[in-house]
Design a protein with these regions (language model features):
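C-terminal substrate-recognition "lid" of short-chain dehydrogenase/reductases
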Residues: 127, 135, 213-241, 246
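Residue(s) in the substrate-gating loop at a strand-loop-helix junction
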Residues: 143
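Conserved glycine-rich cofactor-binding loop
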Residues: 8, 15-16
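Short, small/polar-rich loop/turn modules that mediate ligand/substrate recognition or access, typified
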Residues: 175, 180, 234-236
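Substrate-binding pocket helix/loop in short-chain dehydrogenase/reductase
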Residues: 99-100, 107-112, 194, 205
Length: 247
């Protein structure tokens, strides 16, 4: 039996990259996993099929979690299937990188809506069930950019910094119900997003990282599993998984 046997988890943005790795890692420890996606149905189904092939239980759920009604509907579908929700991983996010001089109002609001508002919508959707259960683990995927800032990413930095502040307040309010709320702040991680960066720029970024390499999605997933399975007395914290790029 795994550390998370019979636990029910929702992972947003779970069809690829870090979200995919998190979904697979939670399932490997026995959790039943709702694999959320917005547009990548085939990729989400592949994650579900992989989990089932390994003896686990999972289902795909399409929801644009930047919309309150869709986030709540997603949670309701999980409750209808598995009667509970124990773990929420708020991972879904986007970028629209431009310097402040070129950033549009739409660039700003779209990133805030997708990255920050989605965390609020999903968290408040699972809260009543976790409070009733007297158990819950909420893990929000932030970024070192929310701590250090990054050129051309004012909107992204604000959204990820907001996640950290939200995490601390939610942790204060939910601790008495045995619901922990923590944030993970990854550094530069090998994902589709990083793959789009020109190789020359990647080398410049890698040179900034004390450990001399990019992170792996699986390394982020290991930290999520730790918080979900063993982090009973950890709440309101931001945990950096970044190779030392920000200390």
């Amino acid at each position: 039996m795994g550390k998370l046997t019979d636990r029910v988890a929702i992972v947003t943005g779970a069809s690829r990259g870090i979200g995919r790795a998190i979904a697979l890692a939670l399932a490997a420890e026995g959790a039943k996993v709702a694999v959320n996606y917005n547009s990548s149905a085939a990729a989400a189904q592949e994650v579900v099929d992989t989990i089932i092939a390994q003896g686990g239980e999972a289902m795909p759920i399409r929801a644009n979690v930047s919309q309150a009604d869709e986030a709540r509907s997603m949670v309701q579908q999980v409750i209808e299937r598995w009667r509970r929700v124990d773990i929420l991983v708020n991972n879904a996010g986007i970028t629209r990188d431009r310097t402040l001089r070129k950033l549009t109002d739409e660039d700003w609001s779209t990133v805030i809506q997708n990255n920050l508002n989605s965390v609020y919508y999903c968290t408040t959707a699972v809260m009543p069930y976790m409070i009733e259960q007297k158990y819950g683990r909420i893990i929000n995927i932030s970024s070192f950019v929310g701590q250090a800032g990054n050129f051309g990413q004012a909107n992204y930095a604000a959204s990820k910094g907001g996640i950290i502040a939200f995490t601390k307040t939610a942790a204060l309010e939910l601790a008495k119900y045995n619901v922990t709320v923590n944030a993970l702040a990854p550094g530069f991680t090998i994902t589709d997003m990083l793959a789009k960066v020109p190789e020359q720029i990647q080398e410049q970024i890698r040179a900034r990282i004390p450990m001399g390499r990019f992170g792996l999605p699986e390394e982020i997933a290991k930290a999520v599993v730790f918080l979900a399975a063993d982090g009973d007395y950890i709440t309101g914290q931001q945990i950096n998984v970044n190779g030392g790029v920000y200390m």
